[in-house]
Amino acid sequence: MNNSTNSSNNGLAITSPYKTFEVVFIVLVAGSLSLVTIIGNILVMVSIKVNRHLQTVNNYFLFSLACADLIIGVFSMNLYTLYTVIGYWPLGPVVCDLWLALDYVVSNASVMNLLIISFDRYFCVTKPLTYPVKRTTKMAGMMIAAAWVLSFILWAPAILFWQFIVGVRTVEDGECYIQFFSNAAVTFGTAIAAFYLPVIIMTVLYWHISRASKSRIKKEKKEPVANQDPVSPSLVQGRIVKPNNNNMPGGDGGLEHNKIQNGKAPRDGVTENCVQGEEKESSNDSTSVSAVASNMRDDEITQDENTVSTSLGHSRDDNSKQTCIKIVTKAQKGDVCTPTSTTVELVGSSGQNGDEKQNIVARKIVKMTKQPAKKKPPPSREKKVTRTILAILLAFIITWAPYNVMVLINTFCAPCIPNTVWTIGYWLCYINSTINPACYALCNATFKKTFKHLLMCHYKNIGATR
């Protein structure tokens, strides 16, 4: 940072390049931005901690990003404001180098976290069958650690030890900037590695993500008939499984569980882990049926056998105390997250009257599953996650591009960049840390609701907010 300095002067009015009212204005604005950044990123971190619906792999990456942004809000913004309004660096060369190392390592960690988020979403969309198996909390932790370690290796040694590498410290007293920025090769190398290359990669990844998402939505829209046809009786099995208490094998208590989907094992939960950051919604009719059946009261059960066209196999055993009703429905194409089977257990019914009531419940379930399935809406959760990534990516490019362009220009022509323009460009990088929490809230309803509960001190049931 090439601020005009005069370390021999002690008065603010003499050393500061700004007038008194300008200093007050800068301090108020910078202090407000710092406070908003701190509060916003603390809200993100606390929201993920207290709300179990936000404790997803994707949001763990956002948690790491919020940690980096919080450090920027606490240290980087305030020290740079001090440096700006006073007009010189008052804390000595050691603190200067430590501040610069922390500032650039944390800022680059933000970039690396954005890169990880983009890669994570890309693999979720392009490899929905294989990637979720590897997408574990442990893997996320390793990726986050790698982002921070790489950022440290890229910036900290060069900032802290460059003066020893070249044999002299060229940064004058009262100034604080990275010494190797005067070296064109090193400046270009770090700028490309820290900004330009990640931006290119993230842009390409987002283009592929967007194209894959649009292709999936178009494919679903082309199949309205398959989504609206009634479920065929051959694909609906209502089975009453009555375990014999005298011959119950170990393990599952004698209940029979068969998962059938056109002769293949169902693809349960294949991509559900990849659609993170949003509330999980149930869109399968058999799931709704199981909820209705489990909540039925005896007085709600009426014998309406004429409405059932599917026969139900059953066996009688007065000693049995469990009934298992299993519904297997045909999974919709393109909806690999929807369960293909639902098991409903009715406990406590025995004897002939109990069997009759259970049979009636089974018939009602089969009747409900035979109703025409509602057309599944477009995958809004997937669109919201993609939209969040787009918002974060655009905010990053807009706020970081001016400074990184000026860094390259400064290598060849330092006087070409006015001090005020440099300061604004530097501050724009910091403002990105202020914007990120707003991106989460605007693009993610669960984050937004949790933020609201925390700010209004409504802690009841906050852990289950959707």
UniProtKB/Swiss-Prot annotation:
PANTHER family of this UniProt entry?
A: 5-HYDROXYTRYPTAMINE RECEPTOR (PTHR24247), MUSCARINIC ACETYLCHOLINE RECEPTOR M2 (PTHR24247:SF207)
Q: Which GO terms describe its cellular component?
A: asymmetric synapse; axon terminus; cholinergic synapse; dendrite; glutamatergic synapse; membrane; neuronal cell body; plasma membrane
Q: Which organism is it from?
A: Rattus norvegicus (Rat)
Can you tell me which family this protein belongs to?
Belongs to the G-protein coupled receptor 1 family. Muscarinic acetylcholine receptor subfamily. CHRM2 sub-subfamily.
Gene designation: Chrm2
The listed location of motif Important for signaling is 120-122, 436-440
Q: Which GO terms of type biological process are on file?
A: adenylate cyclase-inhibiting G protein-coupled acetylcholine receptor signaling pathway; chemical synaptic transmission; G protein-coupled acetylcholine receptor signaling pathway; G protein-coupled receptor signaling pathway, coupled to cyclic nucleotide second messenger; presynaptic modulation of chemical synaptic transmission; regulation of heart contraction; regulation of smooth muscle contraction; response to ethanol
Record GO terms (molecular function)? arrestin family protein binding; G protein-coupled acetylcholine receptor activity
What is the designated name of this protein? Answer: Muscarinic acetylcholine receptor M2
- Which residues carry the post-translational modification Phosphoserine, per the record? S232
Q: Does the keyword Heme apply?
A: no
| Basic and acidic residues bias: start-end ranges | 254-270
UniProt PTM: Phosphorylated in response to agonist treatment.
Query: Pfam families from the entry?
Result: 7tm_1
Which residues are on the Extracellular side of the membrane? 1-22, 81-97, 163-184, 411-418
Question: Entry's InterPro entries?
Answer: GPCR_Rhodpsn, GPCR_Rhodpsn_7TM, Musac_Ach_M2_rcpt, Musac_Ach_rcpt
Carrying Phosphothreonine, the residues are: T446, T450, T465
Q: Subunit notes for this chain?
A: Interacts with ARRB1 and ARRB2. Interacts with RACK1; the interaction regulates CHRM2 internalization.
Summarize the protein's role.
Answer: The muscarinic acetylcholine receptor mediates various cellular responses, including inhibition of adenylate cyclase, breakdown of phosphoinositides and modulation of potassium channels through the action of G proteins. Primary transducing effect is adenylate cyclase inhibition. Signaling promotes phospholipase C activity, leading to the release of inositol trisphosphate (IP3); this then triggers calcium ion release into the cytosol.
Q: Which UniProt keywords apply?
A: Cell membrane, Disulfide bond, G-protein coupled receptor, Glycoprotein, Membrane, Phosphoprotein, Postsynaptic cell membrane, Receptor, Synapse, Transducer, Transmembrane, Transmembrane helix
**Sugar-modified residues:** N2, N3, N6
Which cysteines share a disulfide bond? Answer: C96-C176, C413-C416
Instruction: Write down the CDD domains for this protein, in alphabetical order.
Output: 7tmA_mAChR_M2
Which cellular compartments is it found in? Cell membrane; Postsynaptic cell membrane
- For region Disordered, the annotated ranges are 218-289
Instruction: State the superkingdom.
Output: Eukaryota
Q: Where are the transmembrane segments?
A: 23-45, 60-80, 98-119, 140-162, 185-209, 388-410, 419-442
Kindly give the membrane topology term recorded for this protein. Answer: Multi-pass membrane protein
